[in-house]
């Protein structure tokens, strides 16, 4: 016996004397455009801004050859962070978008091994020099003994994050800083 819906057919199937069981036959699969539109419609204004910024980043990053040689882009998400692998599960690069403070950041996120960040911190002046930071206080160090993860990050003021004219500059800064950190 067959019953039909828009996305699948359902058959009643019985083998020998067993109890009848439903058998689903998928006849229509959701299309990715419709899924993307549905997902976007459910996002808040801030989430849409974050998604649009990371999409812009993915479009701008290939223009920066040093960045593209070092990193693999990932699918943009409606979240405040965008992670880049560095070939180790112990740490990764993390870029963030802070819509409240209107700034970007790039830094190293270490999952558990606090010694990694401690070694960087003990060479703070050298780290600042390599990253092209004049004032070492521009590096924010987050070493909390009560948390597993630790990190350092560099902040970049953006003005109004809603002003998309600022985004090219922000994307270029992120690409440059990530290459320097690596």
Where do the model's predicted regions map?
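C-terminal helix of von Willebrand factor
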Residues: 9-39
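Polyanion-binding interface signature
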Residues: 39-158
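Tryptophan-centered motif/residue detector
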Residues: 24, 33-34, 54, 79-83, ...
């Amino acid at each position: 016996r067959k019953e039909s819906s828009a996305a699948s057919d359902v058959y009643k199937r019985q083998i020998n004397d067993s109890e009848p069981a439903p058998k689903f036959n998928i006849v229509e699969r959701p299309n990715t455009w419709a899924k993307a539109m549905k997902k976007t419609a459910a996002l808040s204004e801030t989430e849409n801004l974050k998604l649009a910024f990371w999409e812009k980043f993915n479009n701008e990053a290939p223009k920066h050859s040093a960045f593209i040689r070092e990193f693999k882009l990932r699918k943009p998400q409606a979240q405040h962070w965008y992670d880049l692998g560095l070939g180790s599960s112990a740490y990764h690069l993390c870029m963030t978008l802070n819509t409240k403070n209107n700034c970007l950041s790039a830094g190293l996120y270490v999952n558990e091994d606090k010694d990694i960040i401690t070694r960087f911190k003990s060479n703070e002046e050298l780290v600042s020099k390599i990253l092209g930071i004049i004032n070492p206080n521009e590096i924010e160090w987050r070493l909390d003994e009560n948390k597993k993860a630790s990190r350092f990050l560099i902040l970049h003021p953006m003005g109004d994050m809603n002003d998309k004219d600022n985004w090219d500059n922000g994307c270029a800064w992120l690409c440059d800083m990530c290459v320097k950190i690596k």
